[in-house]
């Protein structure tokens, strides 16, 4: 605590005294300072602080009377006695050196104003701090010190004092190095950190404050290891997804030429990725069940259904280009292909009515429900709308999406059937209703679409004819009124009285 308070006081002094650097001090004050340093063999940290205080006070009062310098030396003597009375154990010295390291690192990083405001105390403190904590050879430290001391400082006495204080610091360094051995590894790692290296210790003391929180990004080794762990876990998840994806891809690769073939695979990938965010425990089980059901599934019926749905989507993509020329022919082409694909997909549609309510809410979020509801909305819209050519492609797209969604719901129903519940009874009970529902929804709806579209075209022609008749009647009425008004004006002009010869209405002579 005392060291931190003293350091705060010194920091305030150095901020409050931006005096000129290295002013010429009198030889008398420098000799007295030398005597004080020789009297007090304190540990290196305290000697550096006392020398800093003495230098501050001597710089403060350099321009004043020489009698004031003796007062500053008395103040310095009091400070030195304070330093002597302080306990010089290993703990206090280590705490002081840590605090000194803190100031030193601030000085090096440029946040503090020691080296900038008053150039004297900054390098002096940095020198002594470096002596107390560096385990490097003394010759390099001596060269840096002599280089810093070669700046114009005044009399030769001041240089003698700096050299003697260096000798004292060296002696005390030799004494205090076994005691303060605890602080040397921390300070070494601190210097590495300030120099831009990758040691984990921060610039404050022993580095335990920021080890767990902020300074992890400075350590590239730990960052790489975390990244590698996250990549391994991601690779595990992706491998479980890609298993099911590869099996479905192998079963559907025979009829893969059309561009709509990528759609159910993408959907399956989304299906396995969406619930992963919600509940990973249940979804791993459901994913493995889906993979097993894909391997144990009847491949012939699935390939037949998917192949016909893909041929159906091919024929629809051709029809979209042909429908602008001949909508009635494309309607004839569309109906048998859609009916044949619906006959193949009937068992999957029977299962879909149940899997849309139960299995889909368990294993995946939204896709087939949305697709079937969208397709039903499209069918309802196409029944009520009056535009032929625009409704046919949307209707064919909705049927293809519904068939793909039903095939996928068939897979998810297989996964839900493996959990032995009473789904088979519900299947058998809901088969008849689903058959009638699917037939009444799809195959008659397309025929109704054709008849409705023909009726709508007839009603359009009728409305056009009635509009043309009504417009012609209105034109005839307007013509009749114009003719009548002209007749009236001509009659009025010709039936004038005899005495009225000019063009105005009033008669002449009145």
Swiss-Prot record:
Q: Where is this region: Disordered?
A: 23-510
After translation, how is this protein modified?
Phosphorylated in the cytosol and extracellular matrix and unphosphorylated in the nucleus. Phosphorylation is necessary for nucleocytoplasmic transport and may be catalyzed by a nuclear isoform of CK2 and can be augmented by calcium. Phosphorylated (in vitro) by FAM20C in the extracellular medium at sites within the S-x-E/pS motif.
One Pfam match: DMP1
InterPro entries in the record, alphabetically?
DMP1
Q: Which GO terms describe its molecular function?
A: extracellular matrix binding
Please note every region of biased composition (Basic and acidic residues).
123-180, 273-288, 299-328, 358-367, 407-417, 481-499
Known tissue expression:
Expressed in fetal brain, bone and tooth particularly in odontoblast, but not in ameloblast. Not expressed in liver and skin.
**How does this chain assemble?**
Interacts with importin alpha.
The entry's function note states: May have a dual function during osteoblast differentiation. In the nucleus of undifferentiated osteoblasts, unphosphorylated form acts as a transcriptional component for activation of osteoblast-specific genes like osteocalcin. During the osteoblast to osteocyte transition phase it is phosphorylated and exported into the extracellular matrix, where it regulates nucleation of hydroxyapatite.
- Identify this protein by name: Dentin matrix acidic phosphoprotein 1
- Organism of origin is Bos taurus
Name of encoding gene: DMP1
């Amino acid at each position: 605590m005392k060291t931190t308070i003293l350091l705060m006081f010194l920091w305030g002094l150095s901020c409050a005294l931006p005096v000129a650097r290295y002013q010429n001090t009198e030889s008398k004050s420098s000799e007295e300072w030398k005597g004080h340093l020789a009297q007090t063999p304190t540990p290196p940290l305290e000697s550096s602080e006392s020398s800093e205080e003495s230098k501050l006070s001597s710089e403060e009062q350099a321009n004043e009377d020489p009698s004031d310098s003796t007062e500053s030396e008395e103040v310095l003597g009091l400070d030195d006695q304070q330093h002597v009375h302080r306990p010089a154990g290993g703990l206090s010295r280590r705490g002081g050196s840590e605090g000194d390291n803190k100031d030193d690192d601030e000085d090096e990083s440029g946040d503090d104003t020691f080296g900038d405001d008053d150039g004297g105390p900054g390098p002096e403190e940095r020198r002594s701090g470096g002596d107390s904590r560096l385990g490097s050879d003394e010759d390099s430290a001596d060269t840096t010190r002599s280089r810093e001391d070669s700046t114009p400082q005044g009399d030769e006495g001041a240089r003698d004092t700096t050299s003697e204080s260096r000798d004292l610091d060296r002696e005390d360094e030799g004494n205090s190095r076994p005691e303060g051995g605890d602080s040397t590894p921390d300070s070494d790692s601190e210097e590495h950190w300030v120099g831009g290296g990758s040691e984990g210790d921060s610039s404050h003391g022993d580095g335990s404050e920021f080890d767990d929180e902020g300074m992890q990004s400075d350590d590239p080794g730990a960052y790489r290891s975390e990244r590698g762990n996250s990549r391994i876990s991601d690779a595990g998840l992706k491998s479980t997804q890609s298993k099911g994806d590869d099996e479905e891809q192998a079963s559907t690769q025979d009829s893969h030429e059309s561009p709509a073939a990528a759609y159910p695979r993408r959907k399956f990938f989304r299906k396995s990725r969406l619930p992963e965010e919600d509940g990973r425990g249940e979804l791993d089980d459901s994913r493995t069940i889906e993979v097993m059901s894909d391997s144990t599934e009847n491949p012939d019926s699935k390939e037949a259904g998917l192949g016909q749905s893909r041929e159906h989507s091919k024929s629809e993509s051709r029809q979209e280009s042909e429908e602008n020329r001949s909508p009635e022919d494309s309607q004839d082409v569309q109906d048998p292909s859609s009916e044949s694909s619906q006959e193949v997909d009937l068992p999957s549609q029977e299962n879909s009515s149940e899997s849309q309510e139960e299995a889909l809410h368990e294993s995946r979020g939204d896709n087939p429900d949305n697709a079937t509801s969208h397709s039903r909305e499209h069918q309802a819209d196409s029944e009520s709308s009056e535009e032929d050519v625009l409704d046919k492609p949307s209707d064919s797209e909705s049927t293809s999406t519904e068939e793909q969604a039903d095939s996928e719901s068939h897979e998810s129903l297989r996964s839900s059937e493996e959990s032995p519940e009473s789904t088979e009874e519900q299947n058998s009970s809901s088969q008849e209703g689903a058959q009638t529902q699917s037939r009444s929804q799809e195959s008659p709806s397309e025929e109704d679409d054709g008849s409705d579209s023909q009726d709508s075209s007839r009603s359009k022609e009728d409305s056009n004819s009635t509009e043309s008749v009504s417009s012609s009647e209105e034109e005839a009425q307007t013509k009749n009124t114009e003719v009548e008004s002209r007749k009236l004006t001509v009659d009025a002009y010709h039936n004038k009285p005899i005495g009225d010869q000019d063009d105005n209405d009033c008669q002449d002579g009145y």
